[in-house]
Amino acid sequence: MAGHSKWANIKRQKARVDAKKGKTFTQLSRAIIVAARHGLPDPAGNFQLRTAIEKAKAAGIPNENIERAIAKGAGTYNDGEANYEEIRYEGYGAGGVAILIEALTDNRNRTAADLRSAFSKNGGNLGETGCVSWMFSHKGVVTLTGEIDEEALLEASLIGEAEGYSAIEDSDEVEVLSAVENLEHLNQTLQDAGFTVKEAELRWFPETEMNLTDEVQIQTILKMIETIEALDDVQTVTSNLAIAPAFATL
């Protein structure tokens, strides 16, 4: 029986991994579709599309799937699939933690209902557009990996008009920040300077963090974020939650 239980657990764990991988593929494919629709279907002339394709390849999405997603965005591939739109949702979690969600959906009513349920079941409230976004800033982020000469990085960052950079704890990576509209320029400048770019993306950052010390509230927030992230329509979830070191293992 012990062997059977272990096998059952392995199967459950594999199912979770497969489900997460499937959601990642869905997210990245939708991002390619939207990027191709908003600009040229050629990655050479569309930075948003180029970065979406790079993420997809890094995640192991087959080239034929990527090409199909580009064609869908360009309108040259019709399989009856609905159009996706980008929507931002905002709300509050337990303890007043601000939550910012970016989604790509073909049915905004379904997505809103799913999110409203996730919030209400975990002590939160889905709010109106703008209720928490003022607490966050939108930035371009270029992640560098490998051996990095800080003097060379400083010089390239100045040329690329970066706003700053910081090392990621317990890794060999550095994140370089810029204004949203400057991301493509910064990314190209860093590559031209010989740095290895792992990723270039837009990201939300909280202006101030909400420090919670109540273990139940922290667990509730983390559960809600996990529930929201599991929704197919959700692309990103950002909060202003700050977890004290004593609760870091929750």
Swiss-Prot record:
Keywords: Cytoplasm, DNA-binding, Transcription, Transcription regulation
One GO-annotated biological process of the protein: regulation of DNA-templated transcription
Annotated family: Belongs to the TACO1 family.
Protein name in UniProt: Probable transcriptional regulatory protein SYNPCC7002_A1640
Organism: Picosynechococcus sp. (strain ATCC 27264 / PCC 7002 / PR-6) (Agmenellum quadruplicatum)
GO molecular function, one term: DNA binding
HAMAP family reported for this sequence: Transcrip_reg_TACO1 (MF_00693)
Gene3D superfamilies attached to this UniProt entry: 1.10.10.200, 3.30.70.980
